């Protein structure tokens, strides 16, 4: 065995000796480290405080007043606005509606987006290497197109399509022999209004998240799929055992963003059903807030609604993180339970042979 003589280069790569007690020594603050933290931590933190925390604190303050918006005069009323809010039947109906949207829209959208992404990325011929379907780029553009159209335009287009007298949807259904839909009011029937609104929101968002998942799936090592294919795993089994665990963080992030969009959903709903629908069946908190502020000029009360909506959004995000952690998510779990470990072993054996 050849003896090696330590050089300056190898010596510089040696780990620094630990301090007493086994603790590593603290690195000294240098100009480079200070400027790095100021640029990449201090500036974003300052922006967050100025544009998020301070306005939110102001919103809490104005939510405790009877401010009318167009006057400098106001009175401090404490928690009266919040008490009034939870005694307001219309607000409670709006709260139930957004809870329904947050429960179904993310679930349906992500399920469809995952299906589209897997089909485009891994749905190619079963023979040969694992690859996407032919014309994947075309299908990716087509699926993404609804997201490119502004939400207000999407809402107005679908409002015309849902029109009971001259709408395209009723015309198509009637042409197929379903005469009961001749003058059916999709946005005027209590039982149909909310599902119709949900469909439009899902239609407008599913393409974006499909493209997001396509990018995430392409980051999964190809040898995992090849090894799973050698093991005899089908497409469904491969998707459940390899693809989903590998893109779990992307799914979690998408679920949070979709939940926030569903809890708001102001643009889509306001474009299609500006009056809140039959018996307020499609009314959202954002719509109620808008009407209270600008129609009744109760800006203090409306601001209190905004504070509650922000709190509900934070609770939703926290629940998503909690569920993900309890079901095995998180960085630590991903290191202990790496997806496709069996496939990795199979690939390693194949390479050794």
From Swiss-Prot:
GO terms for biological process, alphabetical: transmembrane transport
Domain of life: Bacteria
Subcellular localization: Cell membrane
Keyword annotations: Cell membrane, Membrane, Sugar transport, Transmembrane, Transmembrane helix, Transport
One CC-aspect GO term: plasma membrane
Membrane topology: Multi-pass membrane protein
Region annotation (Disordered) ranges: 1-24, 329-353
Sequence ranges of Basic residues compositional bias: 337-353
TM ranges: 36-56, 100-120, 141-161, 197-217, 254-274, 303-323
Annotated ranges, domain ABC transmembrane type-1: 95-320
Function: Part of the ABC transporter complex NgcEFG-MsiK involved in N,N'-diacetylchitobiose ((GlcNAc)2) uptake. Responsible for the translocation of the substrate across the membrane.
Quaternary data: The complex is composed of two ATP-binding proteins (MsiK), two transmembrane proteins (NgcF and NgcG) and a solute-binding protein (NgcE).
Name of the protein in question: Diacetylchitobiose uptake system permease protein NgcF
Species this chain originates from: Streptomyces coelicolor (strain ATCC BAA-471 / A3(2) / M145)
């Amino acid at each position: 065995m050849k003896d090696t003589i330590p050089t300056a280069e190898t010596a510089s790569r040696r780990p620094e000796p630990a301090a007493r007690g086994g603790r590593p020594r603290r690195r000294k603050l240098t100009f480079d480290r200070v400027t790095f933290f100021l640029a990449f931590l201090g500036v974003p933190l300052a922006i967050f405080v100025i544009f998020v925390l301070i306005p939110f604190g102001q919103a809490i303050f104005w939510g405790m007043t009877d401010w009318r918006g167009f006057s400098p005069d106001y009175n401090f009323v404490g928690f009266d606005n919040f008490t009034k809010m939870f005694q307001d039947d219309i607000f409670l109906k709006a709260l139930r509606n957004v809870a329904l949207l947050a429960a179904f829209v993310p679930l349906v959208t992500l399920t469809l987006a995952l299906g589209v992404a897997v089909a485009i990325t891994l749905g190619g011929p079963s023979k040969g290497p694992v690859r996407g379907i032919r014309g994947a780029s075309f299908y990716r553009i087509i699926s993404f197109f609804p997201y490119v159209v502004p939400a207000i335009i999407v809402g107005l287009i679908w409002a015309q399509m849902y029109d009971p007298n001259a709408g395209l949807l009723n015309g198509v259904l009637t042409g197929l022999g379903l005469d009961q839909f001749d003058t059916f009011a999709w946005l005027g029937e209590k039982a149909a209004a909310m599902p119709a609104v949900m469909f439009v929101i899902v239609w407008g968002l599913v393409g974006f998240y499909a493209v997001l998942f396509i990018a995430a799936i392409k980051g999964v090592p190809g040898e995992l799929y090849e090894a799973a294919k050698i093991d005899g795993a089908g497409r469904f089994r491969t998707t459940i055992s390899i693809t989903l665990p590998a893109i779990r963080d992307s799914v979690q992030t998408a679920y949070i963003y979709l939940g926030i969009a569903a809890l708001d959903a102001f643009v889509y709903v306001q474009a299609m059903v500006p009056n809140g629908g039959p018996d307020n069946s499609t009314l959202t908190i954002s719509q109620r807030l808008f009407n209270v502020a600008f129609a009744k000029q109760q800006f203090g009360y409306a601001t209190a609604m905004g504070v509650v909506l922000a709190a509900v959004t934070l609770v939703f995000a926290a629940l998503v993180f909690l569920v993900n952690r309890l079901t095995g998510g998180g960085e630590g779990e991903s290191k202990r339970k790496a997806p496709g470990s069996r496939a990795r072993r199979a690939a390693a054996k194949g390479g050794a042979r």
